[in-house]
Swiss-Prot record:
Keyword Transmembrane helix applies: no
Chain residues that bind NADP(+): I47, K74, N119, Y188, K192, I220, T222
Matching Pfam families: adh_short_C2 (PF13561)
Protein name: Sorbose reductase homolog SOU2
Organism: Candida albicans (strain SC5314 / ATCC MYA-2876)
Taxonomic lineage: Eukaryota, Fungi, Dikarya, Ascomycota, Saccharomycotina
Length: 280
């Protein structure tokens, strides 16, 4: 009598194998987010706002998260322009209880969450970590860039498991895979490496009920890169095969793919959108 074997180490979290998605005959329809609810942290500007607007254009209702820059006007813009439901929520993502409260409020206001993008982040601008006194600067970067995205996943995961499906997308960074020069940013690199591997780890844990992926942007023209002087940016561009920074909207395609049914068999992936930086 042969012994029954299985490759599933996480079957206790839900039934496996998962049910295949029904993909529309027209592949363009697979990229539609109509009827879905998307929640995007750090979406009052930069990459987060570009993603939030892209999701609204694709038909999703969108919950916008902000902290220091109110975004009620942007939620109103999405509703008026694209005919979707949108609302802005203030949240300190480094406070687990605040994250928990906001997620519960979004679930109450929208009825559910289908797509969650953990995008909030800050840059390291202090230079060599060995010259920085104390650990406060380190803790700030790790709290925002790593701990906060775990808080979001920890609260949203049960919603996905209850639904039996969902898409969770982390904003990692090419810095998760390489060491940037000429700027020195050990804290940021380490935090983003943690995000990338957290994404891969949860893709296994959540396989019975959700897909989990990450996007790793390269140099993007947002406020996070404003700390760099022209000489530093010149070096960046010399090391980037496409020779320029990206506009935030150039990342939206990656986030839309991962959120949509077009990516129904994509989990545990990290999509580098870096102008070719990490291949040289």
């Amino acid at each position: 009598m042969s012994k029954e074997t299985t490759s599933y180490t996480n079957a206790k979290l839900g039934p496996l194998p998962t049910k295949a998605a029904t993909i529309p005959d027209n592949i363009l329809d697979a990229f539609s987010l109509k009827g879905k609810v998307a929640s995007v942290t750090g979406s009052s500007g930069g990459i987060g706002w570009a993603v939030a607007e892209g999701y609204a254009q694709a038909g999703a209702d969108v919950a916008i998260w902000y902290n220091s820059h109110p975004a009620d006007d942007k939620a109103e813009y999405l509703t008026k322009t694209y005919g979707v439901k949108s609302k802005a929520y203030k949240c300190n993502v480094t406070d687990f209880q605040d994250v928990e409260k906001v997620v519960k409020q979004i679930e109450s206001d929208f009825g559910t969450i289908d797509i969650f993008v953990a995008n909030a982040g800050v840059a390291w601008t202090e230079g060599p970590e060995i010259d920085v006194k104390g650990v406060d600067k380190w803790n700030k970067v790790v709290d925002v860039d790593l701990n906060s995205v775990y808080y979001c996943a920890h609260v949203v995961g049960p919603i996905f498991r209850k639904k039996g499906k969902g898409s969770f997308i982390f904003t990692a960074s090419m810095s998760a895979s390489i060491v940037n020069v000429p700027q020195l940013q050990a804290a940021y690199n380490a935090a983003k490496a943690g995000v990338k591997h957290l994404s891969k780890s949860l893709s296994v844990e959540w396989a019975p009920f959700a897909r989990v992926n990450s996007v790793s942007p390269g140099y993007i023209a947002t406020h996070l890169s404003e700390f760099a002087d022209p000489d530093v940016k010149s070096k960046w561009l010399q090391l980037t095969p496409l020779g320029r920074e990206a506009k935030p909207r150039e990342l939206v395609g990656a986030y839309l793919y991962l959120a949509s049914d077009a990516a129904s068999y994509t989990t545990g992936a990290d999509l580098a959108v870096d102008g070719g930086y990490t291949v040289i």
